[in-house]
Amino acid sequence: MKTIYLKNKVDVGEKLLGTFLDDSHYDILIQEDCDVYKPIPATDKNPNLEDYLLLKFRKGVFSSEMQETAYQSLREAAGESQNRGIAAGPRTEKSTGRDWVTLLQEKVLETLSGTMTTVTSDNPVDDMYVKYKYSTEAGSRGSVWLTQKRPKDFDFDIWAHSVKNLSPNERLEEVEKVYDWISDTSYANPVNSGIAGYFDRYPRIPYCRTTSYSTNHNDKFGAAVPFIERISNLFKELIPGRWKVQNTEVSKLDPSFRIGNSAYTTITVNKTYRTAAHRDAGDLKEGFGNLSVVSNGVPYTGAYLVFPEFRAAVDVQPGDVIMMDVHEVHGNTPIGGEGERISVVCYMREKMADCKTKAYEDARYNFVENRRLNNKHPLWHERWNGVSKGMWETQEWYKYLVCNGLHEYAAQIETAVYGAKSGVLDI
């Protein structure tokens, strides 16, 4: 087995984020079992090597039967997604069939509305045209034109030059009119990527839950669990310190939010997806990223996993596994050939630590759904999602917990709701 101790880190990550990587971004291509360590400062006389680990790569660690089961079980989890942000790569003006708001248009609108705080020129709109005239890149917000609302004869360039000399109030009025023709939703390039396992709360979906794929394909997902547990066992074998930290955190969760007996709550499944340069987010920082690849057996080329700041790349083939620091900038080289490459990324979602019991999280789900469907609710309105500010410290939620036998959780919010013990739980 090979061990590489890197001497330098090239600070180019921020410049590369969101761009595609290629063969020019690495000098070392790893195609054999290998451990790679980041530069270790000379001042660290007794380093804990796990603190400096960039990656551990092992080839051929899965049987062909296990790979085939994982492929058949997980490939459908990688549906078309627009939620991968910069990892989906750069957007051009007419890419993916969308009429993107270009970077030039975005900057001109910001300038005309007065939100471009760095403008110092007497002719800022003209300056934007000089700076971004030849850019075909979509704007950083990922917005698209609502072509059904935008007048067919609207020409952005003519409009921009016609309003630039209006008074500030008149310009703002014009800009607001144009903003009405632009989507409020941000989009990324569509890619084949999805999640399986379990997911934490966030504002619009305020309950921990089983992902859609694992709910709707429970048998298939269950068939993939031995493959995922095998990755976890390799994690334990190769990086025991990081595994122990992550496994301890996962063990604190309700078993219903753990994938088998693994150190993971969640997996991301990508299908023939060339990721642009990015850093992973949302995983347990003290843990480590674990990735494996399976395929349909048809050859493909490329898809090297590149760490541009370390000038290193790894050729992860079906049946291999890599443990990697996903918080370092990384991405893939182009993928060629007819083969279907399925990458499986296993991790613990950091905010899963906030999840309580399955019964409690299910109660949160049912509470939200009951509100959403109850058109007699005082807050109800068309397209309401059942969520409102402060809802988890209301008498409505407190009584719902009591009625559903979740007295322990009701007691935890009793004082916040009533200002004192209500006496309800004493009855």
Outline where the language-model segments fall.
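Fe(II)/2-oxoglutarate oxygenase catalytic core
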Residues: 1-290, 314, 336-342, 348-427
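Contiguous, well-ordered alpha-helical segments that form the cores/surfaces of helical PPI scaffolds
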Residues: 286-295, 320-323
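Short His-Asn-centered micro-motif
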Residues: 294-295, 307-309, 324-326, 346-347
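A short beta-strand-loop-beta hairpin characteristic of the jelly-roll/cupin
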Residues: 295-317, 358
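Conserved metal-binding segment of the jelly-roll/cupin
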Residues: 314-329
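Short, Lys/Arg- and Gly-enriched loop/turn segments at beta-strand edges
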Residues: 330-336
